[in-house]
Amino acid sequence: MTDRIELTTANEFIARHIGPRAADELAMLHTLGFDSIEALSDSVIPESIKGTSVLNLPAGQSEADALASIKAIASKNQLFKTYIGQGYYNTHTPAPILRNLLENPAWYTAYTPYQPEISQGRLESLLNFQTLISDLTGLPIANASLLDEATAAAEAMTFCKRLSKNKGSQQFFASSHCHPQTLDVLRTRAEPLGITVVVADETELGDVSDYFGALLQYPASNGDVFDYRELAERFHGANALVAVAADLLALTLLTPPGEFGADVAIGSAQRFGVPLGFGGPHAAYFSTRDAFKRDMPGRLVGVSVDRHGKQALRLAMQTREQHIRREKATSNICTAQVLLANIASMYAVYHGPRGLTQIANRVHHLTAILAEGLSQLGLNAEQAYFFDSLTLHTGGRTAALHAAARARHINLREIDDQRLGLSLDETTSQSAVEVLWDIFASTGQTLPDFTALAASVKSRLPAALLRQSAILSHPVFNRYHSETELMRYLRKLADKDLALDRTMIPLGSCTMKLNAASEMIPVTWAEFGNLHPFAPAEQSAGYQQLTDELEAMLCAATGYDAISLQPNAGSQGEYAGLLAIRAYHQSRGDEHRDICLIPSSAHGTNPATANMAGMRVVVTACDARGNVDIEDLRAKALQHREQLAAIMITYPSTHGVFEEGIREICGIVHDNGGQVYIDGANMNAMVGLCAPGKFGGDVSHLNLHKTFCIPHGGGGPGVGPIGVKSHLAPFMPGHARMQRKEGAVCAAPFGSASILPITWMYIRMMGGEGLKRASQLAILNANYISRRLEEHYPVLYTGTNGLVAHECILDLRPIKDSSGISVDDVAKRLIDFGFHAPTMSFPVAGTLMIEPTESESREELDRFCDAMIKIREEIRAVEDGTLDKDDNPLKNAPHTAAEIVGQWSHPYSREQAVYPVDSLIENKYWPPVGRVDNVFGDRNLVCACPSIESYQEA
């Protein structure tokens, strides 16, 4: 009998996303003692929450059908020529960067570079980004990106609060010339912290003694270029710090903030080759003085050496970060915008200092020509000095001019009923300027002569603020200006790294699953990429349909009643969720409720976020099995019942198990007046099996860059939407362009909107059945690894049935005691086997947390398990003295090609060092550096490009 012929393509993508084949799945189930995936699921999910799933989605579409569906949605967006500006500008993404970086899985599927030996390529690109920012802003220390300009401004405000010597002040000055969306996010961030944001015109500012800090815009949002030198001195005289939000392209021509007194510079790198994307994702930047480096938010790439003394890069000063300092961290930000920072970095590498300056001069000269022509037409710009933006007093003609422009498919900036604005960019041409003149000209007026004006117009930048210092003198910005050279440079960097295109990345709590090509394709479509976030609503009908449908999909997956897609990272989702809880309590007159219970096992973002939301953290204990100690929770909830605001709990737990008592935990908190925040970091084990909104959660954030297939990008972008029950829906993030105006947590109404198509595609192709199977296979793969390795490494935590959820924790502490081999040694040795290490020492020191996801095949799981078992054999050889306790393959891992061909003095063979298993002979990853010296890097901090001689040595 022949196989049944399928006449439909429904659900065919499921098998592309799921790793194990049917026969492998059955064999793995038998290893665990089950005969079906349903039986395994039934055994893992606690009785108390079975039946809570409300997932009711149609069958999955084929890849071709889903692409056709989303193309139809995208076509509803109208692409007008946009001159709105306000922090967002049209730009050209150079084709070699688009093809070799943005569309290259070697770049977009990588994880945050916590393992430096396998991350040297993107670390170098990020160091280039830091050098770019430091050079342009005139401040010596820059981080490796933040989420967007508005949240960077909020980070600058809290940074100033920590460091200002005006300790009694709770007031922060923000110029009324800042971008409006920045001011909105500042207000959101300030209120829970008891900070008052005073918005005023700095040109009319008198006494400044009441402020601990200030934020100024350079050039101003309306186009003005102000000289802030005297004002900066006044603020410093009052012991206040000065932050400046600066336009990077303008800084190629203007005096950098660091040279006129700024303590901090922040802004967006969007116009360096990153599409508008309806508001994101874009890389923000943050730079400061050397004295303040230990208080910087975000990640910082620094130069160190490996064990051979060779230059190597790493993430520096990690003790500032939330996963270590928890509620005392400088920020709650984890994932930032690495992929976008790398695009901006390579944009600068490709154009170089001369190319960037030419672009800036062209933009400015066209703006000056436009302004002079408008003056001839009777419209004078309000600005005496400007870079690329103009404000025009158009009086009673304002509405008609907007209408005339839109009739020509052009958007101008709406300011008020008497004024409008224009911002030019690198895509503006002579013909575009002439069209603008035609729109503004009254009937019968002769249009200006472009050629004549181009020959006569003068610069409209203030002479006193023209840049004198050189930019981007490092050779990396002066070499790769042909496409051939840039293509090979990007390939060289990519070859240094390990990403999902080469190997499984089994990081616990990170869900490094497949980012399917069909999911990624719409991201680079112009219909999604070239829309301004503040374009008139009727032009974004496609995005509106996309977000409406995606919100409904996520409600179905979680059991919540409403979704906000605005938070542009998981950390911001946490923050938005706690703000919703806080606002809910305040609306009921319960302002005194400010205690947040957090289990001791929680990720460091939880306490850091609670602190940002104005809550006091009370830690609850965990029992010997890693579960929340319910009696301790009950006692603390009762003790603080009058002040209890919330609990933040991760489910399945951070320890990788489905806690049996989750319903009871939720009930205890509710009975004592609190709300339940369920961290959705581990949602990949629950979709289709149980729903947090149905077993006690009031709010959760979701990591679309984990469960729902947005790639990690080497450390961003991420998306962290929140789902809420109906009583919290009125308190979700708002925006000036939404029905609720207050509570914006990022600059754009839909955050990182242009990558939302990835999640839409994933859900649409998987359908309800596929999403459930993804959860089931994630659980199967984790338990298969756990079972294969348990006789070699103790599995630290399991549920009452001896099973784990979607990840497992291996306890290496006994090995450390018996052999001296540390978790770090095992992690580095895995590199010699071609693997990225699992999560190290989280949530328990001395352990490895492994999450294989549903996308990995049994063959890859076995390859990983075989590597771990082989490593255990090497450890036994250390234990019994066969291998030297100090000079062995683990202590010296990873091994480089240069070491292998050099003088060999180790008591073990070269073959054992680099070919410990036969499969490596045909497919070997060579780390570019040996083990990196972390202590050296922090003691000798260098966070900009070192000399060219260092590169030649590398």
From Swiss-Prot:
Query: EC no.?
Result: 1.4.4.2
Listed under catalytic activity are:
N(6)-[(R)-lipoyl]-L-lysyl-[glycine-cleavage complex H protein] + glycine + H(+) = N(6)-[(R)-S(8)-aminomethyldihydrolipoyl]-L-lysyl-[glycine-cleavage complex H protein] + CO2
Q: Which domain of life is it from?
A: Bacteria
The question of whether Oxidoreductase is a record keyword is answered with yes
List the InterPro entries: GcvP (IPR003437), GDC-P_C (IPR049316), GDC-P_N (IPR049315), GDC_P (IPR020581), PyrdxlP-dep_Trfase (IPR015424), PyrdxlP-dep_Trfase_major (IPR015421), PyrdxlP-dep_Trfase_small (IPR015422)
* Top EC class, one word: oxidoreductase
Q: Which GO terms describe its cellular component?
A: cytosol; glycine cleavage complex
* Family matches, as CDD domains: GDC-P (cd00613)
- Which prosthetic group or cofactor does it need? pyridoxal 5'-phosphate
Q: Which UniProt keywords apply?
A: Oxidoreductase, Pyridoxal phosphate
One Pfam family cited in the UniProt record for this chain: GDC-P
A Gene Ontology biological process in which this protein takes part is: glycine decarboxylation via glycine cleavage system
Q: Which GO terms describe its molecular function?
A: glycine binding; glycine dehydrogenase (decarboxylating) activity; pyridoxal phosphate binding
Family per similarity comment = Belongs to the GcvP family.
**Function in brief:** The glycine cleavage system catalyzes the degradation of glycine. The P protein binds the alpha-amino group of glycine through its pyridoxal phosphate cofactor; CO(2) is released and the remaining methylamine moiety is then transferred to the lipoamide cofactor of the H protein.
Give the multimer and partner information. The glycine cleavage system is composed of four proteins: P, T, L and H.
Name of this protein = Glycine dehydrogenase (decarboxylating)
Organism from which the protein derives: Pseudomonas syringae pv. tomato (strain ATCC BAA-871 / DC3000)
- Lineage, highest ranks first: Bacteria, Pseudomonadati, Pseudomonadota, Gammaproteobacteria, Pseudomonadales
User: Which gene holds the coding sequence for this protein?
Assistant: gcvP
